Amino acid sequence: MRINVRVIPRAKLNKIEVQPDGTLRVHTTTAPTDGKATADVIRMLAEHYNVPKTSIRLIRGETSRDKVFEI
């Protein structure tokens, strides 16, 4: 399953919002340096979908706010 994600780094709270078009907006308190925000997003997605972190793979958007993950 592929998931389109819009990442909001340096947010006040960690949360996941489902948009009407099916994409996810993931708010993370982590700064977008050295892939730390992406790692935090993977952790949050793993908790949200109740899967191990190792089963989530970044397909596109390593340095972008718009990312595509595969579970």
Where are these regions (language model features)?
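Absolute protein N-terminus
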Residues: 1-2
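C-terminal structural segments of small proteins and small subunits
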Residues: 34-35, 42-71
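Active-site-proximal or metal-binding-adjacent scaffold patches in catalytic folds
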Residues: 12-15
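Compact, glycine-rich, soluble single-domain proteins
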Residues: 6, 19-44, 48-49
